[in-house]
């Protein structure tokens, strides 16, 4: 029988077993519903983390300068095509509409990593500056994969307990808000687990959140 612990205990266990490098903290949500592949949510984290890829024309590249943002056009696409691991560590990618057809060259690299820009979530836009500013301000979005599981990175162990705990709480509340009004939470979410890059996962008592 699997052990289920409080969110506080789960995060503290990850922090206690942390390695020397700044591991990411990931959450996996399993749903009961057969329609879970359609679940998605957009929300805002209190504490931002991660890096952003931006595919756009040169005039748009100088609008928002930040160390967490990498801009580029076709030359960036070729860099990623030549070195797949280039995208490691990036959390989101944005694109201007004219660039979308060109991204087909690296769709097989971006897609499995959840980095293919999606217009449904405002990631394909002419207003690159506004989209970048929103993400750096904490905007986050997640959707279930083909297996009906929602994976989310809520931060890095270097952020410390308090920031991770608050990001985790906001993420869970945003997921819970996608529940139909006539369905109880325990009939909607099957399980929620947290894990770090090198650590074991812990199942969380999400009903106590």
From Swiss-Prot:
GO CC terms in record: large ribosomal subunit
GO molecular function, one term: tRNA binding
Keyword tags: Repressor, Ribonucleoprotein, Ribosomal protein, RNA-binding, rRNA-binding, Translation regulation, tRNA-binding
One Pfam family named in its UniProt record: Ribosomal_L1
Domain of life of the source: Bacteria
Functional description taken from the UniProt entry: Binds directly to 23S rRNA. The L1 stalk is quite mobile in the ribosome, and is involved in E site tRNA release. Protein L1 is also a translational repressor protein, it controls the translation of the L11 operon by binding to its mRNA.
Family: Belongs to the universal ribosomal protein uL1 family.
Subunit structure of this chain's protein: Part of the 50S ribosomal subunit.
Name of the molecule in the record: Large ribosomal subunit protein uL1
Gene it is expressed from: rplA
